[in-house]
Amino acid sequence: MRGQVGDLSPQQQEALARFRETLQDLLPTLPKADDYFLLRWLRARNFDLKKSEDMLRKHVEFRNQQNLDQILTWQAPEVIQLYDSGGLSGYDYEGCPVWFDIIGTMDPKGLFMSASKQDMIRKRIKVCEMLLHECELQSQKLGRKIERMVMVFDMEGLSLRHLWKPAVEVYQQFFAILEANYPETVKNLIIIRAPKLFPVAFNLVKSFMGEETQKKIVILGGNWKQELVKFVSPDQLPVEFGGTMTDPDGNPKCLTKINYGGEVPKRYYLSNQERPQYEHSVVVGRGSSHQVENEILFPGCVLRWQFASDGGDIGFGVFLKTRMGERQKAGEMVEVLPSQRYNAHMVPEDGSLNCLKAGVYVLRFDNTYSLLHTKKVGYTAEVLLPDKACEEKLQGLGSVSPP
């Protein structure tokens, strides 16, 4: 038995009745109180009544905190409306809404320089609520229950800039919210045009997805257009994605339905952005340098960093050691990212490097040019690992988009 309306075992039917009885105080506050809604929470916790009740009560708290009953009327800041990608394409063969998330054309740093993290996350919560509202409209239209959504993630153009920590944290928090507050609502998460960097990106958000959600991930290979129409009818897909749908003016991307993002104009940038919090702090003496070693065990990992300085600008470069177990001078190592001076005392810096070789990579903060001033540097450095299963899946699919 699948634990759905019309397909319940006697034990599941009894659990549903007991669940409803336990929630008498909560039922009037729920967006829905029918069997379909309650069974979603029971299935999410394998019909464990206590765990299901705890999950639903926490969701009600979340609804109140986020004022979800009014969120569909909430207007995101203009910069998010114009430059945060995504859109409802249409419906799959069963009538479930299909949402496209366009990753590669997004300008994560521009968005975060122009809007708050809270508004970025709230926009994604609004999308979830909007898609559930679409499910209700589809249920009324089709005369049968529609309660799941399809999400398509277009990864073409995914690059190191999309692995910027604040941007990744938005998707980590989004998937955590999806798991905790929208159980059993995702039908499929479809990945198209995934580049070689995708396993690293996936590994950053995977732990925020439940096991059942991970099972719903479908990665399409080089023939993704032919495969995508097995999930969604061509007349519900833009020509850009292998369908037949266009805008009234013939645009194959259907810009009236899907926002493709783009570079955020600097006029939207806010001047009062908070400085990031760093994990480490070091004083780099006048005429000296400081090295931070990071061991890369195998190719394909990404080295990511953030830093800011006090007391003036600071030199920064990335090097690969040629001898282990001893400190090497810059001239004795392989220069991977050329050293240059950054005005990190004015604007915090961040970056990342796709490590093509294994070895010890050195982040070098250089103050050798300053004979008068010491510099205080706050920094965070971390190694991002690819998800090996995902990497093998991409390799098995053969033709994928270039990195």
UniProtKB/Swiss-Prot annotation:
Tell me which Pfam families the record gives.
CRAL_TRIO, CRAL_TRIO_N
Keyword list, A-Z: Lipid-binding, Transport
Cysteine pairings via disulfide bonds: none
* Source organism, top-level taxon: Eukaryota
Transmembrane spans: none
In this protein, which residues make up the domain named CRAL-TRIO? 76-249
Recorded GO molecular functions are: lipid binding
Provide the GOLD domain boundaries: 275-383
Can the keyword Transport be found in this entry's annotation? yes
Function statement = Probable hydrophobic ligand-binding protein; may play a role in the transport of hydrophobic ligands like tocopherol, squalene and phospholipids.
Protein's name according to its UniProt entry: SEC14-like protein 4
Q: Which organism is it from?
A: Mus musculus
